[in-house]
């Protein structure tokens, strides 16, 4: 028997080995590929199609994984004109997050051709990912945390700004920082994508996801980093969401497979929990 852990990462380059293997193939994944026609979808369908499903909530109910709760923080876009925008001549002018969001959304809504819709959608997402108000909120959030916490940032520069210790491909101290975080000598670490899967951090009880992307797979993988505790413990995942923006739809999409009773929505303006996003 061959066990393919994280089988959603299968590539066509693995075909020669799999074709020549005469035994049973068992694939294991928490996020099977869903995009039909993609390389990874084809590989999973060919060599280890889904035969049995066991959800995260079934695993927590059966004490295989520790329990969890998700707190969605409903943030407002900033109206302060401190967002630098570059002109064609290389100089800068300043807008606010609110004004910039109105502009990129207007461009998206006015786009007619599919390629233009796709382009303006990506540009809107990139704009939202660069807004600094989430960074300020994260810093205030982790300042009040006494346990080990990982922050999933949007960019390498953002990860470096948020925590004193970061983990990403251009940081030469990444492996050292991960070691310090794993053994408990530091309790805060920011990263981008590389800790989304395949890395287990002992005693990791808290995580912050700055941007959900509307991607259920990425969100599941990141929350999965918090499900390695003793089954009697509970992990907390914080997800930041800009209120009254497309960010709400992205977060809802990313969390659609999770137990709704374990999700709470916090409004920091009134310091109260609300019923829905």
Give each language-model segment a name.
Residues 9-11, 34-35, 198, 216, ...:
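Catalytic P-loop NTPase motifs of RecA-like helicase/translocase cores
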């Amino acid at each position: 028997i061959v066990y393919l852990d994280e089988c959603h990462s299968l590539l066509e380059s693995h075909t020669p080995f799999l074709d020549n293997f005469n035994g049973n193939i068992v694939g294991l994944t928490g996020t099977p590929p869903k995009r039909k026609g993609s390389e990874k979808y084809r590989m999973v369908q060919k060599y280890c199609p889904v035969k049995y499903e066991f959800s995260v909530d079934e695993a927590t109910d059966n004490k295989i994984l520790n329990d969890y709760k998700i707190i969605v923080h409903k943030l407002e876009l900033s109206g302060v004109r401190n967002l630098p925008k570059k002109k064609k001549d290389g100089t800068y002018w300043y807008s606010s997050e609110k004004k910039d969001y109105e502009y990129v959304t207007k461009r998206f809504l006015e786009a007619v051709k599919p390629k233009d819709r796709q382009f303006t959608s990506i540009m809107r997402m990139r704009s939202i990912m660069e807004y600094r108000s989430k960074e300020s909120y994260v810093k205030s959030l982790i300042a009040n945390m006494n346990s080990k916490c990982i922050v999933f940032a949007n960019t390498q520069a953002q990860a470096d700004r948020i925590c004193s210790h970061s983990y990403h491909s251009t940081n030469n101290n990444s492996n050292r920082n991960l070691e310090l975080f794993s053994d408990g000598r530091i309790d805060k670490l920011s990263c981008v994508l590389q800790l989304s899967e395949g890395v287990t951090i002992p005693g990791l009880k808290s995580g912050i996801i700055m941007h959900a992307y509307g991607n259920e797979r990425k969100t599941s993988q990141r929350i999965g980093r918090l499900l390695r505790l003793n089954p009697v413990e509970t992990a907390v995942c914080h997800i930041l969401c800009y209120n009254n923006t497309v960010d709400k739809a992205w977060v809802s999409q990313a969390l659609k497979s999770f137990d709704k009773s374990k999700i709470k929505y916090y409004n920091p303006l009134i310091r109260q929990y609300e019923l829905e996003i």
